[in-house]
From Swiss-Prot:
Protein name: Glycerol-3-phosphate dehydrogenase [NAD(P)+]
Catalyzed reactions per annotation: sn-glycerol 3-phosphate + NAD(+) = dihydroxyacetone phosphate + NADH + H(+); sn-glycerol 3-phosphate + NADP(+) = dihydroxyacetone phosphate + NADPH + H(+)
Keyword Manganese: no
Family: Belongs to the NAD-dependent glycerol-3-phosphate dehydrogenase family.
Binding site for sn-glycerol 3-phosphate: K111, G140, S142, K195, D248, S258, R259, N260
Entry-linked InterPro entries: 6-PGluconate_DH-like_C_sf, 6PGD_dom2, G3P_DH_NAD-dep, G3P_DH_NAD-dep_C, G3P_DH_NAD-dep_N, NAD(P)-bd_dom_sf
Pfam family, one: NAD_Gly3P_dh_N
Organism: Paraburkholderia xenovorans (strain LB400)
SUPFAM superfamilies hit by this protein: 6-phosphogluconate dehydrogenase C-terminal domain-like, NAD(P)-binding Rossmann-fold domains
Cellular component terms (Gene Ontology): cytosol
GO MF term list: glycerol-3-phosphate dehydrogenase [NAD(P)+] activity; NAD binding
Enzyme class name: oxidoreductase
Length: 335
């Protein structure tokens, strides 16, 4: 496929890194609502706030006007990439609808559940754009900084639309980035949400010095929690042993570039959640969606003790070591 027109909506670390990758091959525009951020990007071709030290391609263009960015994605050979957190997803799709500028092919990158509604991202999109069919989620084990540096990465595009899958592969599958395809949107989104919560748990355990045995147990039993929830919600079991399940969980739980793991490490060190989030400078989706994950699990009578322990530490004032002790006191059971 020839060069495409791509609009990336959201200039955080992940949106910036992917826009840089796309601009190597395609006519790419990166949109953000903050004029000062866009001015800095135009002047330096570096996102000093969210991805400092990563040089962006000279061909990448920047835009603060959402309508102009959407116009770019309305071309025949175009793709719209939504790189906002879950909290901003509904508002952005509503703005597309209200402006009458809905791109034909849209993929989103966010991981989590909408806090108030407890909806998955694809459900939020369907609520705002019920007639839109060529859309999906791009996910997998990936740190923005490594992608920005051109290091190898493998991601999955999950969509019910073959056209969306093909368009996404055509846009992203080049250089050091490999794209796999599938249609299990539910499984991919559940994996992306739950792994962030589990990464907080692993960070707590590592911060308490509980050792590699404990880390392996948390990852493995956490994967079981993820799979139970995902299959109940309509995902396929095999999705959770793939890139967007086990792969993303391993990366986020063990990699020190992980914001969610960092939250766990710092909670174990005795810092308060407000203090941690204030100094993080980026969104930690595991904190935002932990309560939604637990509420959904309880509504379906699904046992998720690790997720419950994370929520107890985050929101109920339970000390990290006490939460671990409560997990260890649980009765033995069949694996």
């Amino acid at each position: 496929m020839p060069a495409m027109k791509v609009a990336v909506l959201g200039a955080g670390a992940w949106g910036t890194a992917l826009a840089g990758h796309l601009a190597v091959r395609h006519d790419t525009v990166l949109w953000a609502r903050q004029p000062a951020l866009i001015a800095d990007l135009r002047a330096s071709h570096e996102n000093a706030r969210y991805l400092a030290g990563v040089a962006l391609p000279p061909a990448l263009r920047y835009e603060t006007d959402l309508n102009a960015a959407l116009d770019h994605a309305l071309a025949d050979n175009a793709l719209c990439v939504v790189a906002t957190p879950v909290a901003g997803l509904r508002g952005l799709f509503r703005a597309m609808r209200d402006a009458g500028k809905v791109p034909a092919h849209v993929v989103w990158l966010c991981k989590g559940f909408e806090a108030d509604s407890q909806l998955m991202p694809h459900q939020v999109v369907a609520a705002e754009l019920p007639e839109h069919g060529s859309n999906g989620v791009l996910s997998g084990p990936s740190f923005a900084r490594e992608v920005g540096q051109g290091l190898p990465v493998a991601l999955t595009i999950a969509s019910a639309s073959a056209a969306c899958r093909e368009r996404t592969v055509a846009a992203f599958h080049h250089g050091a980035m490999r794209i796999y395809t599938g249609d299990d949107v539910v499984g991919v989104e559940v994996g992306g949400a739950v792994k962030n919560v589990l990464a907080i748990a692993t960070g707590i355990a590592d911060g308490l010095g509980l050792g590699l045995n404990a880390r392996a147990a948390l990852i493995t039993r956490g994967l079981a929690e993820m799979s139970r929830l995902g299959v109940t919600l309509g995902g396929r079991a095999e999705t959770f042993t793939g890139l967007t399940g086990l792969g993303d969980l391993i990366l986020t739980a063990t990699g020190d570039l992980s914001r969610n793991r960092t939250v766990g490490l710092q909670l174990a060190a005795g810092r308060t959640l407000d203090d941690i989030l204030g100094g993080l400078g980026h969104v930690a989706e595991g904190v935002r969606c932990a309560q939604a994950v637990l509420a959904i699990a309880r509504a379906h009578a699904i046992e998720m003790p690790i997720t419950q322990a994370v929520c107890a530490v985050l929101f109920d004032g339970v000390a990290p070591r006490d939460a671990v002790s409560a997990l260890l006191r649980r009765d033995s059971k069949a694996e």
